[in-house]
């Protein structure tokens, strides 16, 4: 979208923010975002960006949650940020064939930075990035047979939960993306795979076949959030997953959506070190997610809400496998919860 959102606000504990008012696009799926800006032209270029300022009235110490009483009186801290700057590029080849891409610069791009790691007892750790990254978030080719039947292959957005399905900055009131879903799920969740989608009456559906997540990247702080990323030049695909999303628009101004995900995550990395043990003990690390979300946009009100629940099978065994990683391994050596839940609502 050709909108530039600038936020200059104080962020108080829960992340309450003010944004520049504009026409909401919350009814639009992120999976369609590139083509929605094509304007029926052969070649289309678009994009958006965010510049934010926030002040957080809580400690930035890595132990602020585990030892809350010791740091409850720490001073506040502020920061400027460029969470996302995105460039869209699409091309219509004709006869139902289209190509779409989305390049995203997060937090100012790449470089080198230091951060304090909770898992390393608060030690400084250097990352080969500048607190951000450059990602190819979408890159696909699509064949449209009709409004109700489209097939898409390539790198696609996985629309699990409200935030992933509607992640553009005018689709939430907070300065940053809502913390619940953004903490436990990959966000924006994008992987390489195949998608079948379409619109049937008042319903929009999408079914995806994807590579499974990597259990070695799960953690106690962020559950499966890092499971969709890869430290390699490719994405290991020893295991597979399916994702489903259905949205209903029967009531004017109201969108109701459900989404689900199921896939195995153990033995889905380079080398397949866990293959023998996983097979002998029938370990799968099955990730199961179910979500419900809604958006109401009418009568000068916008209301959004979501409820998400996820379960990880063989969670204790994931810890045993990650604990065997060497110190030079890019993976976590951490416990991970067997379940996670996020819920939220906003209105304005």
Label each residue range with its predicted role.
Residues 57-64, 111-118, 132-134, 165-170, ...:
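Outer-membrane beta-barrel translocator domains and adjoining extracellular loop/strand segments
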Residues 64-65, 72, 76:
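Acidic/histidine-rich helix-loop elements
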Residues 64, 249-348:
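Detector for outer-membrane/organellar transmembrane beta-barrel domains
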Residues 217, 223-271:
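Loop-centered beta-sheet repeat module
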Residues 2-64:
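N-terminal periplasmic/intermembrane-space "pro-region" immediately following the signal or transit peptide
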């Amino acid at each position: 979208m050709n909108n530039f959102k600038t936020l200059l606000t104080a962020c108080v504990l829960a992340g309450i923010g003010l944004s520049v008012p504009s026409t909401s696009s919350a009814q639009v799926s992120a999976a369609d975002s590139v083509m929605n800006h094509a304007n029926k032209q052969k070649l289309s270029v678009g994009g958006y960006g965010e510049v934010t300022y926030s002040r957080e009235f809580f400690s930035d110490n890595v132990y602020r949650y585990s030892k809350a009483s010791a740091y409850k009186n720490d001073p506040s801290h502020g920061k400027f940020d460029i969470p996302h700057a995105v460039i869209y590029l699409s091309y219509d080849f004709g006869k139902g064939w289209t190509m779409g891409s989305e390049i995203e610069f997060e937090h100012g791009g790449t470089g080198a930075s230091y951060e304090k790691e909770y898992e390393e007892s608060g030690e400084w750790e250097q990352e080969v990035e500048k607190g951000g990254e450059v990602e190819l978030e979408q890159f696909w080719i699509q064949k449209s047979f009709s409004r109700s039947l489209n097939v898409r292959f390539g790198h696609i957005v996985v629309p699990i939960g409200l935030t992933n399905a509607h992640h553009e900055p005018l689709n939430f009131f907070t300065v940053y993306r809502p913390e619940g879903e953004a903490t436990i799920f990959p966000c924006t969740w994008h992987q390489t795979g195949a998608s079948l989608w379409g619109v049937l009456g008042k319903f929009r559906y999408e079914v995806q076949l994807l590579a499974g997540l990597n259990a070695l990247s799960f953690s106690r702080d962020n559950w499966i959030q890092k499971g969709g990323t890869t430290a390699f030049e490719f994405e290991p695909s020893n295991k597979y997953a399916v994702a489903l999303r259905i949205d209903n628009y029967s009531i004017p101004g109201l969108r109701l959506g459900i989404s689900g995900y199921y896939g195995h995550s153990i033995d889905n990395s380079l080398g397949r070190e866990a293959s023998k043990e996983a097979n002998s003990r029938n370990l799968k690390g099955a990730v199961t997610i179910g979500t419900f979300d809604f958006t109401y946009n009418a009568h000068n009100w916008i209301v959004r809400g979501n409820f998400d629940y996820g379960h990880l099978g063989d969670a204790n065994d994931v810890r045993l496998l990650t604990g065997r990683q060497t110190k030079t391994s890019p993976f976590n050596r951490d416990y991970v919860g067997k379940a996670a839940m996020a819920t939220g609502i906003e209105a304005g």
